Amino acid sequence: SLVGSEMCIRDSCDIEPDTYNLDPVSLEAHIQSVLAEGTLRPRAVVAVDFLGNPAKYDELDAICKKYGLLLIEDAAQGTGASYKGRKCGSFGDIATTSFFPSKPLGCYGDGGAVFTDDDEIAELLRSYKVHGKGPKGKYDNVRIGLNSRLDTLQAGVMLPKLAVLDQEIAMRQEIAERYHDAFAGKLQLPVITDGCVSAYAQYCMLAKDEAQRQNILDAMAAANIPSLIYYPTPLHVLDAFAPYPAEELPNAAHYARCNFGVPFSPYLTREDQDAVIRTVLEEL
């Protein structure tokens, strides 16, 4: 939303077909294409820890440094995940996260946070979150800002949840492993880069085509098992971006056509896991 509201021109890149994350090869190709055209100047890269799976930050950071770009980590689904021993939310020049209830660390309403180790950026963010306040106080507005302060109630909700976050991430790994064992070789499963730990904000698989996906979703609905598509439309073809040319991003398009998510929570009972596994396997 901020990218659009700040009149930035977005240039979407494709995802990797196995991790579903930003493809460093596609990214560099897009950067070179924009530079060669000469009309626009790339300024920043936004990398998403999609579904809780850490993006490839070594490669992305090297590309950003090569071309003098800011790297922004969207860790909304990645809180609790780690990339080569380093927690998500600590990469790039700026990292953002969400505390929406469906996220790995969620409150009971809306909330979020921005992380940076740059003092100038931090001071600017403190201004933006309180209506664009200046050094003289909150009524000294020096820029157009937002009302984006996390309220005390939501912070209080998250404190005990933060204390058990690592435990919940470990529980998510156990359930993901059960799903992996059950569906391996039958559906395309999420691939986690070596040395990384996914937060598994959701557990999504790819059917072979839309017809198979629909059969699976219908079977789950008949068994009163919830399911969702994360997400049905690639970002670059949303109506909000209609003024911009829709690039050909085949991996993103295939993911949107074939993905589906099954119930997933650190507290999902083994009985419920068995029901999910049994119902999906019956349609394969």
Which residues make up each language-model segment?
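Conserved active-site segment immediately N-terminal to the catalytic lysine
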Residues: E73-Y108, G137-V142
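Active-site PLP attachment segment
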Residues: S90-K129, T152
